[in-house]
């Protein structure tokens, strides 16, 4: 066997080992000593995976130079097998390992190809009262169910920006699904975000919770509220979008790095120049449009019936289904 082949096989074996143990300490990375390791951990980069998914610019502020940061990021990505091209077949094999959380609504699960995916950001858009927060509450319960019942046997993180989280609703849904209501609440890590900056800090802090606990769902309800309130007017639009872009990028990295399903809700805004068709469009512009992996639009129908439409997806066809909001949660 050639030296080159042996080296390649060794790299593959090392990447497989690290992939099976993603929480390997950052100080185990080649070229990282205790001092640099301590600096990285102080800023929230505890593992090789944390560093591999970080941006060079962020690390440069910690280690002192972009050149040094580039070396560290490349070493981490090489260790994880993220440093080169792979075949489309390997991508397919990896996607077969994607996990899904049932919404608890059979028709909606079918529309989504089995439920809410991990390693992706799913955006839920709709007017006030369309059922966005109700769906988030239900997902925070559903993720706790065992896999044979549509869940992942895991916990959830819930970042609330508009004070709409209700423990009482969680208890109702949990009881209807055969879970102990108090235990269901105990399996949800909750935080109220009071500003856009606070919201972004909470996402950073969520990484630590995910590492320490069996978390498979992160909810941000709503992702846009603070950004719209703090950056009003066209004169602040560029700054708002730049900040929102970083926030969405952080959520995408978190979803992929930790095999977590990220669900964000989004508000709608009117288009006064539209005279035909739907005059509403999602807030957040192209930043959210390009940042979310899957986009779901909820709207009211008669009484307690809601309509869910998938309107943007890499592979799902457009389609819509109806569901009902009851005391027991969302049902067909």
From Swiss-Prot:
GO terms for biological process: DNA recombination; DNA repair. Pfam families: HHH_5 (PF14520), Rad51 (PF08423). Keywords: ATP-binding, DNA damage, DNA recombination, DNA-binding, Nucleotide-binding. It comes from the Archaea. The keyword Nuclease does not apply. Belongs to the eukaryotic RecA-like protein family. Involved in DNA repair and in homologous recombination. Binds and assemble on single-stranded DNA to form a nucleoprotein filament. Hydrolyzes ATP in a ssDNA-dependent manner and promotes DNA strand exchange between homologous DNA molecules. This is DNA repair and recombination protein RadA. The lineage of its organism: Archaea, Thermoproteota, Thermoprotei, Thermoproteales, Thermoproteaceae.
């Amino acid at each position: 066997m050639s030296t080159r082949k042996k080296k390649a096989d060794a790299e593959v074996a090392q990447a497989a080992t690290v992939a099976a143990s993603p929480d390997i300490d950052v100080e185990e990375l080649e070229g990282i000593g205790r001092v640099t390791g301590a600096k990285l951990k102080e800023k929230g980069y505890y593992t090789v995976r944390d560093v591999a998914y970080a941006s060079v610019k962020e690390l440069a502020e910690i280690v002192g130079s972009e050149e040094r940061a580039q070396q560290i990021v490349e070493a981490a990505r090489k260790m994880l097998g993220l440093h080169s091209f792979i075949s489309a077949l390997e991508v397919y094999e990896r996607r077969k390992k994607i996990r899904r959380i049932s919404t608890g609504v059979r028709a909606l699960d079918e529309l989504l190809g089995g439920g809410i995916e991990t390693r992706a950001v799913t955006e839920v858009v709709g007017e006030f009262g369309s059922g966005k927060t109700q769906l988030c509450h239900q997902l925070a319960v559903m993720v706790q169910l065992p896999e044979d019942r549509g869940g992942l046997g895991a916990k959830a993180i819930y970042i609330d920006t508009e004070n709409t989280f209700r423990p009482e609703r969680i208890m109702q849904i949990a009881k209807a699904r055969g879970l102990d209501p108090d235990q269901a609440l105990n399996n949800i890590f909750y935080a109220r975000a009071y500003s856009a900056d606070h919201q972004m800090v909470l996402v950073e802090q969520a990484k630590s919770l995910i590492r320490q606990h069996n978390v498979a769902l992160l909810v941000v309800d709503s992702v846009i509220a603070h950004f719209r309130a703090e950056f009003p007017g066209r004169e602040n639009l560029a700054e708002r979008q730049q900040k929102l872009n970083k926030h969405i990028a952080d959520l995408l990295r978190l979803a992929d790095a930790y095999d977590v399903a990220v669900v964000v809700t989004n508000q709608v805004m009117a288009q006064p120049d539209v005279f035909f068709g739907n005059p509403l469009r999602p807030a957040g512009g192209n930043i959210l449009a390009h940042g979310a992996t899957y986009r779901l639009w909820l709207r009211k129908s008669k009484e307690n019936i809601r309509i869910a439409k998938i309107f943007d997806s890499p592979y799902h066809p457009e389609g819509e289904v109806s569901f009902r909001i009851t005391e027991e949660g969302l049902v067909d």
